[in-house]
């Protein structure tokens, strides 16, 4: 279990200094946690006893107070080890703060970080605004606080606290609700006196709610938290990964050879230490220690931090070690995480290809919609701004229905080797191919579940197998993933599970009934359908299993996971993969948020770091994943934008999944291919600043055009706007640069002079860089040995 701090002030008896390492034991191995009482500022009630009892979001919707049965006034975060007052008050009165610019005094001290529990009260809307830290010297620091939705449907966001129900105004709902932990770095050399919350008071746009706030005090170098995961070491699935969080409040730096980190416990031994070569005052890193445990057991662990001559120890009582098989229980599935290869890969190619490429219509800006939704929009004109219904009538006439497009989905020029070679040339590390979209047409062998696939209609080829085989043969470094639609719009076997996304004529939905020709009213065929008893048991889950076991997908990229059999599928797949030594991952859209490894924002990016892994997808088309013939060449994403988005997302712990929509014949729009190749030249030259990097704890960016990434050996400054040759560039963020470090322009082998001043770190951009480079310019700070 996690050490719980029940006093407002509780401090550790010993710390580890980078400059003077001594052999000591710190009870609990934790920093000091100050849990800030918020009672005076509470102005909203989030937890109700019955539908309509509490008004969390202005619509008399709320969390369910019964879901708090296991909480006794304190929550300890497994991710950070931080303790919070939660719930914040007696639950018959206010229990959270709607941010209205409140100024909250805190006990004056030199804090390392400020931690929040937050949520957005707007369904599926991520809110971000600035919180202001006020210091005793009358200076301030503004930093972003981002709140993800308290609940969402289909595209879900996994919270740090997950509750099974939601109260609507008049009824209960069994979609999960969430609260999220946010960590913000504070300059530990300054005395913090107050925290000023942002002002977010518009219920239409959504409001940020704060449920708890805690402050961390660190003295010197401290192991702040350990987290035994169920992740396994690549190449040896008997080895468990333990995540160690180490923070340095200074004043000394971790320099030179740095420190090694290992872990000892009864029945547990370290087989691979972690290394930290550089850690500046105010900085924090999460590193992995690989261990082998004799069995699953709760034991007291000692973490040792070692320099070349001295050691310091930190003790963590009653932590569970050992690898376990997954079960269908949600508390088991939530332990699964994205593997290291995915976290380090950063960049993948998404491919949407199916019969929807035949009409290939989504109109153009500002009337564009997803072209792969053509069938849906022709039957739901109230939801459509693209004029799909009118386009279909004037182009194909009233008697052509969607399944008639199968014969024109020819793949006549489809060359899987050309595809995977393009993915490699683009610099991508993985790809995700749409195995089946919402139209129910699959491009793989669906066996007995349906005949509605590319082996029987259209290309008469196993498209997925051909692409996967080409990748294995010609580009074996590419990881292989599959998009899979959980429901099918017009499959009548889905009828008993049919749903709408919300009430009203403009709702998107999966009715599970046969479509009717929107021009003639006649019932449309569902070509290839075979008799089954249950959609989930006989089609959905078996198709996922085919992808998992026959095609050996490494990424199960679900979409629209409402009704599902995911718990059984996940537990079996996770266990099978572990037994075979395969590192696989699954996204947040399979219907069970607890089992998700990474979030999936769509056509947007986060504006600050998310410590929980995420991947943003969007098309090279302005607003379509499938091929859209209405898009002019000039509107497709260019190489500069590809690089800028990849750099931005990488700096914030995200991956970039960039989509292309091939034509019905299998060719890729030429302007897309050109941009991918051009971006790939830059990506491959600057690979060390992108792949295998991590985010920086203190800041992801400075201003609009500067981003940061790091490895254990170097720190990278990425400029999305070209610096002026012969002039100084000043970075105000507290960069981890020290005397003796070598700064170079990456790929140019040009050394850059630097100096430290009151305003920050100044770099003299070399005159010889005039006219050199494109898209993004990178400085590398190589750490001195």
Give the positions of each predicted feature.
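Fungal secretory targeting signals
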Residues: 1-24
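Poly-acidic low-complexity segments
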Residues: 2-4, 27-55, 67, 181, ...
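Intrinsically disordered, low-complexity segments enriched in polar/charged residues with Gly/Pro
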Residues: 8, 118-120, 171, 264, ...
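Sterically constrained small-residue positions within well-ordered secondary structures
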Residues: 8-15, 64, 68, 77, ...
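Amphipathic alpha-helical interaction segments
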Residues: 17-19, 49, 158-159, 165, ...
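N-terminal/edge-of-domain interface segments
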Residues: 21-220
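Mature catalytic domains of secreted/periplasmic carbohydrate-active enzymes
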Residues: 198, 203-204, 215-785
